């Protein structure tokens, strides 16, 4: 499917012109449109084919320095949207107008679309692969192809637009044995291709490891977080590196730029041209950039939007994103990459004497404080370099900052988990508690 870019541009220009004629000093229009085609399988059977479209337009204005924002979904009456934004601006305090200047840039389309028949085949292949070895399991698969288009234009001449197509495949398997219930989930997002057999094989491997239930080792023991579970740790660092948190003084790293904050093996960065969540510009029209946050354990940069950067006395890093169309830009991330190590996942396991593997967790993350206590939804015990079975009723507690200073090993098995590209890692300094069988 192709979007009508001419109609979108005409609407954006009309909104800017009407806003300025109505008394706005400056104005900005952000349009977001998406079209999603999907196939949803439940209990091993096709449940439905999905076809959805959405379109939203956000107008941001300043009058007498006061900002106002109004949003419309679907067809838009330009004057009504302008009047609403200007009325809302009267409720806000004056601020420095922060808009990008620029010229018209249309970025190349990323990705390619596939027909619904291909989505059906991917879903069927994943289910057949899982049930070949475990015929008793119930599989749920959600496979879709999403086309997204973004247009950002303002009264200072900025006009940037981008379109991309992304595939998503999420699979979960329910395995019931008497009163023992287990759900294993996996999936991926990609602009290139989907490998349903590989996803199913990942789940099969975890079912193999869960054949036996065993007692967990307890106390302060090494914990191996798989690439699927490691984002729980990285979420805390993402909050600590947020320029707005630094400005507020709530980040524990506010005064540590240039200092060692994690183990020296850890390097974290963002890359605008890598992965399914890459993007050429942020929601303020600033070009995104390659940015190193932590290099060999040393804090290098915080990420910020235009307003936060100005208040911090630095330039924006191109990380001004809106949580929703009706929100103002705030510091945000589009991708997060952790430099992998050199040891395979099985090599990491082989060097563990007695440890826990965490693959899925229940509950929220640690927050910016770093303190956490989570239930292990899916985990395993390692003894003398071998996985001996699944652990149940187990909790892991500790502090993220402490754990990442006590890094034992980074794996080479980096994978995308949402917008986070991370390998597995082994950390110390955490406490494990569990029920004895």
What kind of feature is each model-predicted range?
Residues 1-279, 286-289, 295-298, 384-386, ...:
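Active-site bordering "gate/hinge" segments
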Residues 103-104, 253-437:
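Dual-mode signal for accessory low-complexity, basic/Gly-rich regions
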């Amino acid at each position: 499917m192709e979007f009508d870019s001419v109609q979108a541009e005409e609407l954006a220009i009309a909104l800017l012109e009407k806003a300025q004629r109505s008394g706005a000093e400056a104005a900005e229009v952000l349009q977001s449109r998406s079209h999603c085609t999907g196939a949803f399988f439940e209990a091993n059977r096709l449940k439905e084919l999905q076809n959805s479209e959405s379109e939203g337009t956000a107008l941001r204005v300043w009058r007498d320095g006061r900002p106002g924002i109004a949003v419309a979904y679907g067809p838009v009456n330009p004057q009504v949207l302008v009047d609403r934004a200007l009325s809302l601006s009267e409720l806000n305090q004056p601020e420095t107008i922060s808009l990008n200047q620029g010229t018209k840039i249309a970025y190349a389309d990323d990705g390619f679309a596939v027909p619904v028949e291909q989505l059906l085949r991917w879903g069927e292949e994943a289910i057949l692969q899982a049930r070949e070895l475990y015929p008793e399991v119930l599989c749920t698969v959600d496979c879709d192809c999403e086309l997204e288009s973004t247009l950002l234009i303002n009264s200072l001449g900025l006009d940037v637009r981008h379109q991309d197509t992304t595939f998503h495949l999420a699979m979960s398997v329910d395995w019931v044995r008497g009163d023992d219930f287990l759900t294993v989930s996996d999936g991926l997002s990609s602009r290139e291709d989907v490998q349903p057999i590989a996803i199913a094989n990942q789940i099969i491997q975890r079912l193999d490891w869960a054949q036996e239930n065993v007692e967990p080792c307890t106390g302060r023991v090494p914990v191996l977080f798989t690439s699927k579970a490691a984002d729980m740790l990285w979420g805390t660092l993402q909050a600590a590196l947020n320029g707005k948190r630094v400005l507020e003084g709530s980040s524990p790293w506010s005064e540590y730029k240039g200092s060692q904050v994690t183990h020296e093996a850890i390097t974290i960065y963002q890359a605008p041209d890598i992965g399914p969540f890459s993007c050429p510009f942020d929601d303020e029209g600033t070009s995104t950039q390659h940015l190193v946050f932590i290099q060999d354990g040393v804090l290098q940069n915080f990420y910020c939007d235009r307003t936060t950067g100005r208040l911090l006395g630095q330039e924006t890093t191109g990380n001004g994103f809106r949580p929703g169309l009706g929100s103002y830009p705030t510091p945000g991330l589009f991708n997060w990459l952790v430099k992998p190590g050199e040891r395979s996942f099985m090599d990491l396991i082989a060097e563990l004497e007695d440890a826990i593997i965490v693959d899925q967790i229940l509950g929220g993350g640690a927050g910016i404080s770093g303190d956490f206590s989570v239930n292990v939804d899916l985990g395993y015990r390692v003894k003398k370099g071998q996985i001996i079975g699944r652990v149940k009723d187990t909790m892991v507690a500790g502090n993220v900052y402490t754990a990442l200073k006590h890094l034992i090993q980074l794996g080479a098995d980096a994978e995308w988990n949402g917008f986070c590209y991370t390998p597995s890692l082994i950390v110390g300094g955490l406490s494990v508690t569990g029920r004895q069988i």
